[in-house]
């Protein structure tokens, strides 16, 4: 995050950092208060980008605590942030949620709860698009496939990554820049008539 902050500032932008546990309501409220103090009461774009796999576990290996940790990290955090900040978004604003290809196809081995939590995000995106549309607020999500990030560095074996990348029409993994460009588009006025959409970005690995 500090590296990203430096890049933004070096390119003439202005960015700030605030550390918070987005699975806890009181922490989200502290984040909101910080944003109001630093940036005022208006928020044109909200990008919900928290989440993670935590671990690959089959059903027999999962317990209630693991269920709660995965759902809290991926879906509860998105709910709490959206709930806290939606009142600050004016007409013409946009929300972009980070879902996953796993929401479409159930994910890889040991990721059933992760896939379910991301599936909740795709449905929630559609619901919020209907609810917030009359207020002029658009809500969309992106569903990345195999992206070259620390997520797969940690949880996906190199051989499996190579096999999957070679099976895509574009014959490569995606990059964080690929995903960021799509998020930028959906947040911009170029997507002014798009809402409730869950955009695949996976190099043709899967179609929906």
What are the roles of these predicted feature ranges?
Residues 1-42, 54-55:
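Short-chain dehydrogenase/reductase
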Residues 56, 183-184, 195-208:
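Short C-terminal tail/terminal secondary-structure segment
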Residues 57-59, 63-69, 152, 164:
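Substrate-binding pocket helix/loop in short-chain dehydrogenase/reductase
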Residues 62, 106-115, 127:
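Active-site loop-to-helix junction immediately N-terminal to the catalytic Tyr of the SDR YXXXK motif
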Residues 82, 117, 125:
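Active-site helix of classical SDR
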Residues 87, 130-134, 192:
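Alpha-helical segment proximal to the catalytic Tyr-Lys
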Residues 100:
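Residue(s) in the substrate-gating loop at a strand-loop-helix junction
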């Amino acid at each position: 995050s500090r590296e990203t902050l430096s890049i933004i500032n070096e390119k003439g932008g202005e960015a700030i950092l605030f550390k918070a546990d987005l699975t806890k309501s009181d922490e989200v409220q502290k984040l909101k208060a910080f944003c109001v103090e630093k940036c005022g009461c208006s928020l044109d774009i909200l990008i919900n980008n928290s989440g993670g796999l935590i671990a690959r576990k089959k059903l027999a290996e999962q317990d209630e605590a693991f269920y709660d940790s995965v759902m809290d990290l991926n879906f509860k955090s998105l709910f709490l942030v959206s709930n806290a900040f939606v009142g600050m978004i004016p007409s013409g604003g946009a929300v972009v949620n980070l879902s996953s290809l796993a929401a479409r196809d159930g994910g890889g081995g040991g990721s059933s709860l992760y896939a379910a939590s991301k599936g909740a995000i795709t449905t929630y995106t559609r619901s919020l698009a209907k609810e917030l549309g009359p207020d002029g607020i658009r809500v969309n999500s992106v569903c990345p496939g195999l992206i070259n990030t620390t997520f797969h560095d940690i949880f996906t074996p190199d051989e499996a990554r190579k096999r999957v990348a070679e099976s895509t029409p574009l014959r490569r993994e995606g990059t964080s820049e690929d995903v960021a460009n799509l998020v930028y588009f959906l947040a911009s006025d170029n997507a002014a008539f798009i809402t409730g959409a869950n955009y695949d970005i996976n190099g043709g690995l899967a179609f929906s």
